[in-house]
Amino acid sequence: RKFATQADLMESVEVVIAGYQKKNRILSDKEKLIVSYHEVGHALVAAMQTNSAPVQKITIIPRTSGALGYTMQVEEGEHFLMNKTEMENKIATFTGGRAAEELIFGEITTGASNDIEQATKFARAMITRYGMNEEFDMVAMESVSNQYLGGDSSLTCSMETQTLIDQKVVQLVKEQHQKAKKILEDNVMKLHEIAKFLYEHETITGEEFMAVSYTHLTLPTNREV
């Protein structure tokens, strides 16, 4: 071919995000179903919260990064700042996959390992770096060395305060996990519908997801409309 297509460009973006498609990794039917619900859990929780980046694609095609599937969200326009609500929403979205597994299968898997890491990272940063905890206010609890080289971070507080920080991190992640569960419980029929579609087609575009998602969806009671 002489020209790259839009699909080629999208695949290039996905290679950067998640690696190449690993077509020789064949999931069992049960694993494929679990991954379908897991990814749709992320997407639904994201869609049902304010100020969340739009879902562009959901797929259960394994990638060389090790991901068995992923949900792609892309900000509309440039976005340099995140407020407290947006960060809490990100944490809730990270927990959405595990929440879907719990709700549908009554069991949890190892598939949420990266989600757990990211949710914890965001929660800790909110408390130690961004002053988003009322008790600590605008006191820096963490310092970062070689910030522009992806440097290491270290806590700059007493052991007692570090213990309290750990408690605050756990509390924050738990709260957002419960929020994710509530969103999925309120929209369980859509969860089933979209997960079934993903299971059958392996990939859903953002347009397809939004077309289905906003048909008779139940909005959270605290959502601003």
Predicted features and spans:
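Generic detector of well-ordered alpha-helical packing
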Residues: 39-40, 225
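Soluble catalytic regions of large protease machineries
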Residues: 33-37, 43-217
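C-terminal helical "lid" subdomain and adjoining coupling/linker elements of P-loop NTPases
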Residues: 1-8, 16-33, 131-137
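Single conserved hydrophobic/aromatic residue that forms the stacking wall/gate
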Residues: 216-225
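Short, conserved phosphate-binding/catalytic loop or strand-edge motifs used
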Residues: 10-15, 64-67
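Ca2+-coordinating acidic residues in Ca2+-binding motifs
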Residues: 8, 208, 221
